Amino acid sequence: MYGYGYGGGCCSYGGYGYGGCGYGYGRTFALIVVLFILLIIVGAAYLGGGCC
């Protein structure tokens, strides 16, 4: 489920505007990026005691 794009069937897997075939990660890559950004935001808010 992670590295389909570089082999066959990359286009059929699809992606969120990452081009499926071009990057080869598709939804999994987008999901990891979103989770990573959320983790950074939550971590910064927790360690910094809030945004304000």
Swiss-Prot record:
One of its GO terms (cellular component) is membrane. Keywords: Membrane, Transmembrane, Transmembrane helix. The keyword Cytoplasm does not apply. Its main location: membrane. It is found in: Membrane. It is a single-pass membrane protein. Belongs to the SscA family. This is Uncharacterized membrane protein YkzV. The gene is ykzV.
